[in-house]
């Protein structure tokens, strides 16, 4: 909608289409990278077989009887239409021209025999159906006879488009039956869904809203939350509080604001009633197709919803094979066969993934060209709205697909110019509506936090993450409810980390002021208790009684006491920050070995600010946003266009998505750690920063592969008792392999070696006793077969299910691997039989119910120079009995 308005404003004079009309049309016959143009140009529908007559064919077959002397040949003869239009034969025909000898035994009809009498053809009664072959020559009558004989034996198409075909046909659902069966209506809407992105967005919004009645109640209460009823208790009738003709006494600005709010209120009311029908359709989809009643909407997990959608997909497979090219193009992005957990997440976050990647790779210049503000990123909710309008609304069409012009290198200059114009137009638009937006932000903030601050004044100093921090912390394909669950769990640890740093000077001053204000407050309070009537009316200063100063000094005492740290607080900022990293999963590279420093604390404080400061920055953002749109963002328009072209791929059945959002579960996240060779500039450009790709990969597996029934990352369900593994058979005393087996087992270890191996974790923690429970049997149900990760990736360790206890977070909890772990390559048995390892290992664990087995441990210890002894050792490892289990 915004692009249409902008296109009308910038439309050229004359009858030619504007740039945005050409962009929205999206039909370019010369460029269609994701489809096979040669095959899509042909329609092989059985209801259009009339166009496949022998006369319209470009190939004729000359048959010879098996007993004849001639040799059967299949010759290519261009038709008159082909010769006149200058159409050459395709490549596959030119390659086969030399090999056109057909054995006589494979020919269809004898050459000399007359064809049998064919039954009367019903198509002959239709004057438009009969066609005269375009080929001329002596073979025309013979080929026509052969064609009639072949069609008489086996019809290739329906005789008449309006006649009833013979044989059993599917029975259509009667109109009365469908109108009385809500499940059939819901199934019909599901089958005829034309925009899967929009439909899945409605399904997710319905799930996140908690059902039909919760959404309607929230919308109805929103319409009346700005009404003030403070004057109602003081009056007895309505006319006492109404000022007659009050608008005449107001200024023009107030009248404009009242009328604007009135139209906005009416528009929201209309939208509220229109939305009921759409919500009813989604409600029927949940109740009748997914078997989820309304009362379970507030308790069911999203993973269970995805499993039911996949089951519904399996119950209604695709049956049509002969489809038109336009429908084939449509199904290239709207196929219901691509509806597992990863595909649904890609559809819901198709646009958000691009914004996450652009912020991660610093494509957007969010700093002002001002000397004292250079280098400081200005990002607010207002800025987020304009980024959605300027970039995403231009890059995507109505179906949620990336415009193909963004994928063409020859359109780079024009797109960059138009994007720069959109930034400038949005900047002037923001300057025009800045007063309205400022009033809206102030009113919403006041009505939202007034009661909270009045009830608890300490909430004024409460902190929360900024909008920029949320986009930095968010991972690819991470849905909003999963992201905010993870983020909200980090708030206590983030507050504890901020309070960790020593502020001795501030605390000393705060203690002194708290002691003085507390003493004065105590004296005034005791005096008011002894003689309340006389003391409370006593004025210490002019018109300022005792109760006034009692409130002032009590507020000062409460504020200063809040600035003093608790006496039981243990000072360990590095440990506190690791607890934060466990949930935010955000660790820049320059934070390594500096988690205790004040520099890291200052950078984290820019992401975790007080709510009052965030509100002031939001109001200041109304002024800084147009400056960014006018001066900073137009300079990076070329990089934005290049980003969409270079980081967009086409997935069959899904459409165009961000390349970072397509997880290759067969290969894993790749070599993202620094243990390998240093990547070159090209690899650095095509990879994410701060381990975002690896964090998103393992985070997705942690949410959808561990236990989809609960929806809690890293949760272990109560499973059955572990299966019994018999002990291995030991060799005899005289066996030459006994010494080697004893040396590689726990029995042959000395106490020093065992103690050293067990004391790698702090506190000398020994190996875990017992076999851990097996993962849920639904662990592989939310991913299709082509998305199933191999067994080695399923045991990757995650932050939510760390192998260390919560009391310790070692250096390895930085998301990426920080060093090559030589201990991991030694193959000790305690590392094979328990989920443990060295400090340098990554701690992502997506399947906490599994340990590292001999199979997947040996898979990561490849040595290209092993030699003969290494091969013998690998053979011995494969012949040993394996413990642990894997998912199929």
From Swiss-Prot:
GO terms for molecular function: guanyl-nucleotide exchange factor activity. InterPro entries: Autophagy-rel_prot_9 (IPR007241). Its main location: membrane. It holds the Pfam family ATG9. The chain crosses the membrane at residues 256-276, 423-443, 545-565, 612-632. Homotrimer; forms a homotrimer with a central pore that forms a path between the two membrane leaflets. Forms a homotrimer with a solvated central pore, which is connected laterally to the cytosol through the cavity within each protomer. Acts as a lipid scramblase that uses its central pore to function: the central pore opens laterally to accommodate lipid headgroups, thereby enabling lipid flipping and redistribution of lipids added to the outer leaflet of ATG9-containing vesicles, thereby enabling growth into autophagosomes. This is Autophagy-related protein 9.
